[in-house]
């Protein structure tokens, strides 16, 4: 199968590309290196076709989606702080206009399916377990653009017969996060600090929870959606492990994995609309894709440190 992965040199994208190559698929990678890094793909650089560019370049997207079976869209302004007043216009342009260009080109070039990244941020502070049929009110511009993606995908499925499946990613950690720097997952940020003997900084009391899911599991979910024989029209699915871990518990697990006894530093919460709890309901994902995560948080940490 010939698959285009946008944002394929980034954190999640590169994990997906590695999995697709291992599976024997023909992969085209598109990335503009805003946060992606060539180093993320160096081990498989001779097994992929690479195109440097942005999903906002309509002529380029129309050109490279010819003879493609599936598009896996991971390109995005992928963190709420990127949507400051100064960056708002360009971030929305990438997430909304860029994604619509992907969908339009897919229809025009007879691409069978678009698999794309949405976000659990859409749920805001809805009480867990978070279900795909919940009423959602996005708490920030980032989440709003991702909800718009879901609406656009559903309309392209309804009006043009394009198969689409969006993943509401929970809190992803794993390999290849270096390019995300300050936008990296809390697991990775805490790990980086503790490996240097520094105290990780926790906003608030540390009782806030996240559904931490390992990047290898996320890549496998994308692979399953790409390869699925089912008709996936306008689907939206949670990707998590279905278990909540507090930041205090995370520190305990990191200390155990590192053989350390480093205490966190607690500071006042400066973030408005901060998400306090997160745990996915994964029943629909199991039913539609037959997917469930293989890695617990402890197992994921061991795998990262092993590599």
Pin down the residues of each PLM region.
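Hydrophobic alpha-helix immediately C-terminal to the catalytic Tyr-X-X-X-Lys motif of short-chain
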Residues: 148, 152, 156, 186, ...
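Hydrophobic "lid"/C-terminal helical patch
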Residues: 16, 222-226, 254, 301-305
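C-terminal "lid/loop" region of Rossmann-like NAD(P)-dependent oxidoreductases
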Residues: 205, 234-237, 246-251, 259-277
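Conserved C-terminal active-site "lid" loop/helix of NAD(P)H-dependent oxidoreductases
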Residues: 215, 270-292, 299, 303
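Glycine/proline-rich active-site loop of Rossmann-fold NAD(P)-dependent oxidoreductases
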Residues: 147, 172-188, 198-199, 203, ...
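Amphipathic alpha-helical segment in the mid-to-C-terminal domain
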Residues: 141, 179, 183, 215, ...
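N-terminal Rossmann-like NAD(P)+-binding domain of SDR-like oxidoreductases, especially those catalyzing
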Residues: 1-170
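Non-catalytic, hydrophobic alpha-helical segments
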Residues: 218, 222, 239, 250, ...
């Amino acid at each position: 199968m010939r698959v285009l992965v946008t944002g394929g040199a980034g954190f999640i994208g590169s994990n997906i590309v590695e999995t697709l190559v291992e599976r024997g698929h023909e992969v085209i990678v598109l990335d503009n290196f805003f946060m992606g890094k060539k180093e993320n793909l160096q081990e498989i650089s001779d097994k992929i076709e690479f195109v440097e560019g942005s999903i906002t370049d309509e002529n380029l997207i129309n050109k490279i989606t010819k003879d493609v079976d599936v598009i896996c869209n991971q390109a995005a302004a992928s963190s709420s702080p990127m949507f400051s007043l100064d960056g708002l216009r360009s971030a929305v342009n990438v997430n909304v206009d860029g994604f619509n260009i992907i969908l339009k080109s897919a229809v025009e070039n007879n691409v069978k399916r678009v698999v794309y990244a949405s976000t659990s941020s859409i749920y805001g502070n809805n009480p867990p377990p978070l279900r795909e049929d919940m009423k959602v009110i996005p708490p920030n511009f980032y989440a709003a653009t991702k909800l718009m993606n879901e609406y656009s995908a559903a309309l392209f499925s309804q009006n043009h017969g394009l198969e689409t499946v969006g993943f509401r990613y929970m809190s992803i950690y794993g390999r290849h996060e270096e390019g995300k720097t300050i936008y990296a997952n809390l697991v990775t940020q805490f790990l980086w600090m503790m490996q240097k003997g520094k105290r990780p900084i926790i906003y608030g009391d540390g009782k806030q929870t996240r559904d931490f899911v390992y990047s290898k599991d996320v890549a496998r979910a994308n692979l399953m959606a790409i390869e699925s024989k089912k008709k996936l029209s306008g689907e939206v699915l949670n990707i998590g492990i279905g278990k909540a871990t507090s930041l205090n518990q995370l520190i305990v697990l990191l200390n155990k994995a590192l053989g350390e006894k480093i205490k966190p530093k607690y500071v006042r919460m400066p973030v408005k609309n901060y998400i306090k709890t997160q745990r996915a309901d994964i029943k629909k994902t199991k039913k539609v894709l037959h997917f469930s995560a293989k890695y617990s948080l402890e197992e994921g940490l061991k795998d990262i440190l092993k590599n």
